[in-house]
A protein has these predicted regions:
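Amphipathic alpha-helical packing segments from all-alpha helical-bundle domains
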Residues: 69, 94-98, 110-136, 141-144
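Short helix-capping/turn signature of helix-turn-helix
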Residues: 50, 103-110
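N-terminal intrinsically disordered/low-complexity leader segments
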Residues: 1-8
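Helix-turn-helix
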Residues: 13, 17-55, 59
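Generic helix N-cap/helix-start motif at coil->alpha-helix transitions
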Residues: 65-66
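Amphipathic C-terminal alpha-helical segment
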Residues: 106, 147-166
Length: 174
């Protein structure tokens, strides 16, 4: 995979637009032409920053993961479950959308390998952080259940169009 050129404001704008599209409708929800139009550049210019759609989606997933993990790492291990729950809930309240890596995970069998690896990285890092709790040790098995509950709760909130569904589904998370 060619490393994208990220030193431009256009690259960031392209990633922002791609993230919105992916969170709304998945990997196949956008084309370079649509993104170029949104950002205000020629569609051929998108290839300067991201040679392929897979490169762009992988960069978006990497950035999403890095931001999410950095926010969780700032929290003490004993409050990470609640911090993760709060982050998922606030993301839904902000724009009614799904977790980027949750959406991509649902399409993982059809994703380019470079994108699927970034999605797996998100879950591996989150599971590691959630099972790192000092008080009342959380096993990997429990961490898997927590992630499944959070992703599923987002899905339910989206289906029902109400954060209440998320709250009810995650009430038992401590």
């Amino acid at each position: 995979m060619a490393r994208p050129r990220l030193k431009s404001n256009n690259a960031g704008k392209l990633m922002d637009a791609a993230e919105r599209h992916i969170r709304q409708s998945g990997y196949n929800a956008f084309s370079f032409r649509e993104l170029a139009k949104e950002v205000g550049i020629k569609s051929s210019s998108v290839h300067y920053y991201f040679p392929t759609k897979a490169d762009l989606a992988a960069a978006v997933a990497r950035r999403y993961t890095d931001r999410f993990v950095a926010a969780l790492q700032e929290k003490s291990p004993s409050v990470r479950i609640q911090a993760c729950k709060k982050a998922f809930r606030e993301a839904y309240l902000t724009d009614g959308q799904m977790c980027l890596c949750g959406v991509l995970a649902s399409e993982s069998a059809a994703l380019p390998e470079v994108v699927a690896l970034e999605v797996r990285r998100f879950f591996d890092l989150c599971l590691g952080l959630l099972s790192e709790r000092k008080e009342g040790a959380v096993t990997r098995k429990v961490a898997l259940g927590i992630m499944a509950k959070l992703e599923g709760a987002l899905l339910l909130a989206r289906v029902y169009g109400a954060v209440r569904a998320f709250d009810e589904a995650t009430r038992s998370l401590q």
